[in-house]
A protein has these predicted regions:
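N-terminal targeting/trafficking signals and adjacent low-complexity tails
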Residues: 2-607
Length: 607
């Protein structure tokens, strides 16, 4: 018997939607604008709870910490979460030993997980190739928040500093069970010399390997790594011809920055045994060694034993979990909102089953009477699904419906990992996290949808959820080369220039169309057309020039507006200086977290 709350799919959206009075903070409003028409108090409360600026986030977290210190048990970790944190230590320790990033700060943070009053701040992402800035900015945001809260707590309680102000841990969860398709194997750099205005660094995968989990994907071959280096050095050389940064000092600055970064790449490559670890180790090298952060890294695929009790809870309460997701998806669809969450998510179990081929399967939950040693065992819970890659039929018995005793077996647990929405549910329930930073893309939508499930399952959401959607504005070698191509000096001039070209193209079209009609009329009537052909030729030639400029300017726009990978920051700022500028923006500004960050490269230019 298939277990599910309902066989009815989410309702289709109507043609129109309404808008209510949901008003999240001004700077963040655009991020959540499509949710404004959702008349749901849970969603409204969640969105309005997200701080607009960093100082507000610090004050709110300080309030949480002070109240926690003043009370005894309510906010402290209970026995379950403390036991789970102890389990977590083993897997964190394993990662940092293998990555060679077991610094003193990391070691001290691991030890803090033994203290029930320790608060955990969490950020999450896949181990992308040369991860883009947004991934690192999550870590910087939480580290800066941690530092500021600890500093203010120290000022308030000098006499109890060791008891109260140094008990925050930053945890970065590596979602290493994602497939090898899409962004996880792609890194971008701005380059108008390429067709789309960007250079793509890409891990080649075959059809047979694109459905592998990143954790099971072998490390790239030396040939691939060398090719990435060759692509980057070629990009550096071609972009260094710009008049704005072709001086010997700039070329030396760029080259030195790149070589320092590539040393970290080579070190991570030498330690890694999988594609996921190569990218994860590089992130940890940057964060823990170069930046000196005490952020803890851990692999999602290894920590299922930490979530054992949570898996049991979600599976035992699957009808509530499923119904919450179904209702949430139906509600958003009625308002014309596509959250990116699969419409069939509510039908699937909250876990993936891992396949021997290295891929995984979405599974459904079945209840079945089974006999064992001629003694009937009532109501066994079975997970069943088909591997996305090899199409094998996977089955796992979790044991008696009321006890799910096989979830206590680590061999069973290591064959599963949580799906997207359950990840945050489990982090909150089983580890008692206090703060979570979301991305601005799919993770934010998943969190909004998940807020409904939190309520239905009586799980407390993080006390504070943050988003840092700001864009970095700077004039690096790729951006300057792009602007120089269209003889512009400011990135803000690109869109007005593009619109002016489109307007000219439309004007030419307006002049050409009647001439074409007149030419056709004259041909039909046998009248001379030489003059019209001459005029048409001149106009079309001018229009072709405009359209060539439009094509070039579109590449320029892509180059200056894209979110490049960490290589662009390493080259233009140096890895260490990158986080300094991000932190400075947070600490020096009371502007919205959505406000752009004006960053200064080390290049000697007119900018």
């Amino acid at each position: 018997m298939l277990i599910n709350s309902s066989t009815n799919p989410p309702d289709l959206p109507p043609a129109t939607s309404t808008v209510n009075d949901l008003t999240p903070s001004r700077g963040m409003k655009s991020l959540f604008s499509r949710y404004e028409g959702v008349s749901n108090p849970i969603v409204s409360e969640f969105i309005s709870s997200i701080p607009d600026n960093f100082s507000d986030a610090v004050n709110r977290m300080l309030h949480i910490c002070i109240n926690s210190a003043a009370s005894s048990q309510p906010s402290a970790a209970n026995d379950l979460t403390l036991n789970n944190r102890a389990k977590l230590q083993k897997f964190i320790n394993k990662f940092h030993v293998e990555a060679c990033t077991m610094t003193l700060g990391v070691r001290n943070s691991i030890t803090l997980l033994n203290d029930p009053s320790t608060k955990i701040f969490v950020s999450i992402h896949q181990p992308n190739l040369f991860a883009y800035s947004g991934i690192f900015k999550k870590i910087v945001l939480l580290q800066t928040l941690k530092s500021e809260v600890e500093r203010k707590m120290q000022q308030r309680h000098e006499e109890t500093i060791h008891d109260n102000s140094k008990k925050i841990v930053n945890l970065f969860l590596l979602v290493d069970h994602d497939f090898m398709d899409g962004w996880i194997r792609l890194a971008l750099l701005p380059s108008v010399k390429h067709s789309l205005g960007r250079l793509e660094l890409r891990l080649p995968v075959s059809n047979s390997t694109k459905w592998q989990m990143a954790s099971n994907m072998p490390i790239p071959g030396r040939t691939v790594l060398n090719y990435w280096r060759k692509q980057i050095t070629s990009w550096l050389r071609k972009n260094s011809t710009s008049l704005l940064h072709s001086s010997p000092s700039n070329k030396s600055y760029i080259s030195d920055n790149f070589e320092q970064f590539w040393q970290e790449v080579e070190l991570s490559y030498s330690k890694a045994k999988s594609y996921s670890d190569f990218n994860s180790f590089l992130m940890s090298q940057i964060v823990n060694k170069i930046w000196g952060y005490d952020t803890l890294f851990v692999r999602l695929t290894e920590i299922s034993p930490v979530f054992a009790d949570g898996f049991e809870y979600l599976i035992s309460n699957f009808s509530r979990y499923s119904d919450a997701l179904r209702k949430a998806e139906s509600m958003f669809l009625r308002h014309g909102i596509n959250t990116g969450v699969s419409s069939s998510t509510y039908l699937n179990a909250p876990v993936w089953l891992h396949c021997k081929c290295g891929s995984k399967a979405p599974v459904k939950i079945y209840e079945k009477k089974m006999s064992q040693q001629q003694e009937e065992v009532q109501n066994q819970i079975i997970l069943k699904g088909t591997c996305i890659s090899c199409k094998s039929h996977l089955l796992m018995n979790l044991g008696n419906k009321h006890t799910l005793e096989l979830l206590k077996d680590e061999q069973v647990l290591h064959q599963m990992s949580p799906r997207a929405i359950p990840i945050l549910l489990l982090l909150c329930r089983d580890l008692g996290i206090t703060c979570y930073v979301s991305g601005t893309g799919g993770s934010m939508d998943y969190t909004v949808v998940g807020s409904i499930a939190f309520k239905e399952l009586s799980i407390n959401m993080p006390s504070l959820t943050l988003v840092w959607p700001s864009r970095d504005s700077y004039y690096g070698i790729g951006q300057l080369e792009a602007l120089e191509l269209v003889q512009l000096t400011d990135q803000s001039d690109v869109m007005p220039y593009l619109e002016s070209l489109r307007q000219k193209d439309a004007e030419f079209e307006g002049r050409i169309k009647p001439l074409v009609e007149e030419r056709n009329r004259r041909v039909k009537n046998g009248e001379p057309i030489q003059t019209i052909l001459s005029d048409l030729f001149s106009l079309k030639e001018e229009q072709r020039k405009i359209r060539r400029l439009i094509k070039i300017t579109l590449k320029v726009r892509n180059a200056v507006e894209m979110s490049p990978c960490i290589v662009d920051y390493a080259v233009n700022f140096g890895v260490a200086n990158t986080q300094i500028q991000w932190r400075k923006h947070l600490l020096d500004s009371d502007n919205s977290l959505a406000a752009p960050i004006l960053m200064m490269t080390g290049l000697r230019t007119t900018k």
